[in-house]
A protein has these predicted regions:
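Short, hydrophobic-biased segments on the C-terminal half of alpha helices
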Residues: 51-52
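C-terminal regulatory/oligomerization modules of transcriptional regulators
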Residues: 1-6, 25, 30-35, 39-44, ...
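Pre-recognition alpha-helix immediately N-terminal to the DNA-recognition helix
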Residues: 20-22
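Short amphipathic alpha-helical boundary/capping segments
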Residues: 7-14
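Short, cationic-aromatic polyanion-contact patches
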Residues: 15, 65-86
């Protein structure tokens, strides 16, 4: 089975902290490139490259807006994140089990400490 192009993989797209921050910003609503770029210490073309990766991974959608239709407005399309979430959920049981063991260990230690103080 052929692998998708790396730039079209939602896992790789969300691996970058700048792209995750862009997705977080777009959760608040659609935004043009200029508005998104204002949130980052990088050039507008650099932000556009990040947006292209997100668009190729189908995590954002681009549409034309503004009075003359030249402005590019970006919208979050979180559907592909379901694959990422499903994969991450596999590890939830691992963490829950580990936390439950830690809780039991702490509770045993607390109980022993109380018993020793009561003697």
């Amino acid at each position: 089975m052929p692998r998708p192009a790396a730039h079209a993989d939602p896992f790789l797209a969300v691996a970058d902290p700048t792209r995750r921050a862009i997705l977080d910003r777009l959760r608040a609503g659609d935004a043009p490139v200029a508005q998104l770029a204002a949130n980052f210490d990088m050039t507008r073309p650099a932000v556009s490259r990040h947006l292209r990766v997100l668009r190729d991974a189908r995590l954002v959608r681009e549409r034309r807006g503004g009075g003359d239709g030249r402005q590019r407005i970006y919208q979050l399309t979180p559907g592909p994140l379901r694959d990422v979430a499903r994969w991450a959920e596999q590890y939830d049981a691992f963490w829950q089990d580990g936390l439950a063991r830690l809780k039991r260990h702490v509770e045993r230690g607390t109980r022993r400490g109380r018993e020793e103080r009561e003697r």
